[in-house]
Amino acid sequence: MSSAAMSKYVNDMWPGSPQEKASPSTSGSGRSSRLSSRSRSRSSSRSSRRDSRSSSRSSSRSHSRPRRSRRSRSRSRRRHQRKYRRYSRSYSRSRSRSRSHRYHRDSRYERPRRYYKSPSPYRSRSRSRSRGRSQHRWSYYAITRGRRYYGFGRTVYPEDRPRWRERSRTRSRSRSRTPFRLSEKDRMELLEIAKANAAKALGTANFDLPASLRAKEASQGTAVSSSGPKVEHSEKQTEDATKNTSEKSSTQRNIAFSSNNSVAKPLQKTTKAAVEEKSSGSPKIDKKKSPYGLWIPV
């Protein structure tokens, strides 16, 4: 390959060569052909991209448009109905049902139906919401109210008295601040018992008592001596009252009813009629005088 041909090849490949400047027509036509081919390829690629985008958009719109329209229509209908059905029964019922359903579904507000254990009476009330302690808590409340739940159902069986209440009552009695006081009779009985025990232990019935016990014995003797005549007088009065009642019961009169008078009046019997009744044992009834006959007291 000669040097002249080599230089021509290099000049043709190099853009800023003097040979290219000398022949501008040939270089301009080559550039224009290259630019036109590039622009055509770019425009074809852009058009293909646009076509693909438009086709994808149209397909997505065709699938998504009816869904959006349905949603928008349903929302508009709901809003329109809520405006006019705010105070209607059906709307309020649906809301109340949903709320009640949620309320019953929530595990916080449900009471356990089974109670396997009852807590100790001195256990503090726990506010925790764990399962184990909640059972103890509800059963503790049931015991304090005097009721207890059994089995699966909600049947309530009342109890007479819980155990912890009885314990607290007995303790409160033992811890009472007021001292226990004996009456005079109890004291004298205890004194007599003490005398008998002392006589058995010492073997002699004659022994000296302290001054405080002597004063009590003297006061008891005077009370017995003063109460003696009063008791006798009261016994006499009771005997007189019993005698008077027996005499009145023996002198009772028979009552008869007549057709003329509706008011009961006592009959005054003669001595002959009384003697005849005693002899016969049963009184004679005059049917002519009274249609009902004679009433006999039983």
Curated annotation (Swiss-Prot):
Keywords: Methylation, Nucleus, Phosphoprotein. InterPro entries: RSRP1. GO terms for biological process: spliceosomal complex assembly. Transmembrane segments: none annotated. Residues 230-246, 274-289 have a biased composition (Basic and acidic residues). Residues 60-105, 124-135 have a biased composition (Basic residues). PANTHER family: ARGININE/SERINE-RICH PROTEIN 1, ARGININE_SERINE-RICH PROTEIN 1. This is Arginine/serine-rich protein 1. The gene is Rsrp1.
